[in-house]
């Protein structure tokens, strides 16, 4: 990296930061997708449960018995919120990926422009 200009070194550092941001975004997305999947599974189970069955739900630090329809409604609402977050993260991911690819292309051009031909 001794022959690389400070500008290119800075761009390389930016690429590394973008990679870290991408990893963070992908981790968040994965967590939200897992939570949404678990919530969907819970709704499916609740729908198969008899209407007279006791259904419990966390309310803060307390677990309370609630009507099945209310629990389904709350969990469905949670799924919708998670899906909105996932879509938002996907937009961030796409924008960051585009910026990354553009900067990566610039860095490659800079580096390739500085290469000297081999004397073979």
Swiss-Prot record:
> Cross-referenced Gene3D superfamilies, in alphabetical order?
1.10.287.370
| Coiled coil spans | none
Alphabetical GO biological process terms: protein folding
What InterPro entries is this protein classified in?
A: PFD_beta-like (IPR002777), PfdB (IPR012713), Prefoldin (IPR009053)
Residue spans crossing the bilayer: none
Do you know which NCBIfam families this protein is assigned to?
A: gimC_beta
- The protein's name: Prefoldin subunit beta
Species, as recorded? Methanospirillum hungatei JF-1 (strain ATCC 27890 / DSM 864 / NBRC 100397 / JF-1)
């Amino acid at each position: 990296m001794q022959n690389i200009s400070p500008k290119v070194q800075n761009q390389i550092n930016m690429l590394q930061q973008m990679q870290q941001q991408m990893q963070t975004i992908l981790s968040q997305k994965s967590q939200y997708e897992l939570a949404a999947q678990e919530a969907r599974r819970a709704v499916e189970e609740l729908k198969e449960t008899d209407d007279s069955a006791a259904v419990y739900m966390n309310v803060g630090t307390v677990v309370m018995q609630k009507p099945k329809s209310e629990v389904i409604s709350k969990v469905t609402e949670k799924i919708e919120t998670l899906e909105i977050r996932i879509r938002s993260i996907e937009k961030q991911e796409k924008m960051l990926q585009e910026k990354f690819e553009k900067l990566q292309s610039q860095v490659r051009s800079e580096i390739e422009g500085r290469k000297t031909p081999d004397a073979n």
